[in-house]
Curated annotation (Swiss-Prot):
Matching InterPro entries: dUTPase, dUTPase-like, dUTPase-like_sf, dUTPase_trimeric
Swiss-Prot/TrEMBL catalytic activity: dUTP + H2O = dUMP + diphosphate + H(+)
Similarity-based family: Belongs to the dUTPase family.
Cofactor: Mg(2+)
Keywords tagged on the record: Hydrolase, Magnesium, Metal-binding, Nucleotide metabolism
Pathway: Pyrimidine metabolism; dUMP biosynthesis; dUMP from dCTP (dUTP route): step 2/2
Alphabetical list of NCBIfam families matching this protein: dut, PRK00601.1
EC id: 3.6.1.23
Name the record gives this protein: Deoxyuridine 5'-triphosphate nucleotidohydrolase
Residues at which substrate binds: R68, S69, G70, N81, T85, I86, D87
Amino acid sequence: MERCVVKVRRVRGGDQNLPCYMTVHAAGMDLCADLVDDLVLNPGERKLVPTGLAIALPDGFEAQIRPRSGLALKHGIALVNSPGTIDPDYRGEIGVILINHGSEPFVVRRGERIAQMVFAPFARAELVEVDELDETARGEGGFGHTGR
C-alpha cells in the first residue's frame, strides 16, 4: 500500500471534522457537508455541496471523489461526475455535486458524510499518433459485445 502526505486546509476556519478512514482497511476517507443550513435535494435535483476543505496533493497523486454506497442504496443519492477528480495543482475548496435519483426529498445536514475521497497515483501519457493499432482478440467490440 502506497502512502502519501496530503496537506489540508479548513477553508472557512470552522470546527468540522477532517476526513478520516472509518475502518482499518477502508480505501476512502469520508467527506462531510460543510453547511450553515440544511440543504434539501428534491427528486431529480442536483446541487453542489461544500466540504469546507482544500487540499494539496503531492505530485503524481490525484484524489477521486466517489459516492457513498449507503446513500445510493437507501436514498438514491449519487454523484453527477463520478468519480470527480482533484488534480495535484488544484487548491480550491472541494465541492461534491450530489443528485437525488430517489423518489423522496433528501435533506443534507452539516457534518453529514456525503462522499468518499480516495487517493491514487496516476501516470501522464505521451500520445504517439499511428496509422494503425495492434490487433487484439476483442478488436473494436464495444458496448455489450460479450453478451447482455
